[in-house]
């Protein structure tokens, strides 16, 4: 699918797409927020909350983050646990730039097959992306594409049920079956983290 005006969402300040293919479809943005609620987001927040850093291990999240940074974007990790902090960070960056700043939200989803760009829809990542979009809207950054607006308003409507939705989702059930139920419950806590992991070279560190 070509990166044309029909798919690039370039008319909008806040954009949403899925995975590495989504990054290629979207118009270049000043800031890219990577969301993988039970994967990269959870690992990056855990490391940064402890005062450490998260090395970029091989995988879809690392590849997407590097590609976004290579295109000149400021890359951060966001989701349910730090949506408000991410929105505040974006607003600070916009104020520092002195002009409207474009934001692409990239939900990673679940890879269908290793080594391909095929992505399976993941409700946990849709919720995380929606949380960030809703938080941006709360700060007046609300010129959102239809794709982003639907995710943000969907989160507003269902945000009170996040714990149930996450634990009952396919990804949540799979992680719980592997002994990670507590990790799912932690990931479902809204705005419990004030840290924003920012890509700095090959690591994510707290902003």
List PLM regions with ranges.
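Short, structured patches in soluble enzyme cores that scaffold and shape functional sites
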Residues: 79, 105-110
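Actinobacteria-biased recognition of intrinsically disordered, low-complexity terminal regions
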Residues: 1-12, 207
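A short glycine/serine-rich beta->alpha loop
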Residues: 29-31, 114-120
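Residues that scaffold, gate, or flank divalent-cation-dependent active/transport sites
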Residues: 12-31, 37-88
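Short glycine-rich anion-binding loops that position phosphate/pyrophosphate groups of nucleotides
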Residues: 38, 110-111
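Short hydrophobic beta-strand segments
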Residues: 30-35, 102-107
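Long, charged alpha-helical interface segments
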Residues: 59-77, 88, 97-101, 117-207
